[in-house]
Amino acid sequence: MHNTLNKIQFILFPLLVLILISPNVLANKLSCNTNNIDKFIGAENIKSIDISTVKSKKWVKNYLNAYKEPNKIILEKYKKKFLANISIRFNNDLECIFPSKIRINGDYKDHLESTPPIASLDVELLAGNINSTIKFKLFIPHTRGGENEVFATALLKELKFLAPKTLIVPATFNDIKTTFIFQEKITKEFIESNHLREAPILEGDERFRWNIDPNERALGLNPFTLARITNNKWIEKGYTSLNISKDALEQLNKAYLNYSSYQHFSNSNGENLLNLKLSDFINENYIKKEREFKAILIAIGSSHGLIPHNRSFYYDPIYRTFNSIYYDGDSTVVNLKSSNRKLDFIKFGSYLNNDEIIGSSYAIESLNKLNQKIFHKKLLDLGLKFSLE
């Protein structure tokens, strides 16, 4: 009883303080503390983020309703958007205020488990951009494995795989100090920043996965899991983009259906993940890169990102291939421990298949070429405090 009372007081006290605060006014445009163009060019790294909701009372009410819900899952009705002013300070002391929309982000209630009313956030800037990023997530660190997620994305980017910009950043939310993991969303801007032409972005469709047995869900075994295209506006550009999108979705859903029907378990090649070798145009370099991607994710404890409903892809319409995008790997690399539970969905027996063995050799080759000093400097810029010693 005493513990329950303390928990209620812990949640309600900061919320009551917020309710007494006067509502803010949304900034009507991007504003910065300088017009010096050199400052904008040199603003590479985020130093801190300050978020102020325009209607604090409504945010608190929505947060409390989501928190009180007996369901472990955060229901969609609590993911409504709120206006907010986001002030970002960069490493060169440039500071800008962005009018924005924010909402609660995440599937489960661990995304609400911080100092109330702080939650993991989905953010869209209504004016301006942060190094070409307009849409991004601000995760409560423990929901993404803290330093593990930052290290994993940095490593994959350094090895020339597609992975979102991710960093640890000090923050305040309605004057409450906190820390977030900043991670850009997989959007048009993400594709362009990786020097790729705009084309379909696909991901595992999770809309039906909540209606299955929890044990099957944990293993990624969902007969209803298919893929979907996330950049729908690109489809509407014309017949060419529509036909490319249809081709991409048809090919990828073939792989998802094969996986869901367990056909991949009996394939002669021993493939026990999504089989993406679907096109006649696939070359050896693509196969090598995909094998290496899988091997690295397994090695750094990020096999969660290989479960079909967690996967994201960029479709290359010229070669008709699916380039894997790292997302939500739930890595354990920093803690130097592995979870056998995480591997359950891909390990059927005590053997490694050909792809895993060959992919491991490719991964070792790439890691041996890594410039440790340059990579270490990048990790420090992302908010990690690692030593080379």
Where are the language model's segments positioned?
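C-terminal catalytic region of ATP-dependent kinase domains
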Residues: 253-264, 274-281, 301-302, 314-389
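Conserved ATP-binding subdomain of kinase catalytic cores across diverse folds
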Residues: 89-230, 299-302, 318
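Catalytic-loop signature of eukaryotic-like protein kinases
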Residues: 170, 305-314
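Bacterial N-terminal signal peptides that target proteins for export
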Residues: 2-12
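ATP-dependent phospho-/nucleotidyl transfer catalytic cores
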Residues: 188-299
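Bacterial N-terminal signal peptides
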Residues: 11-20
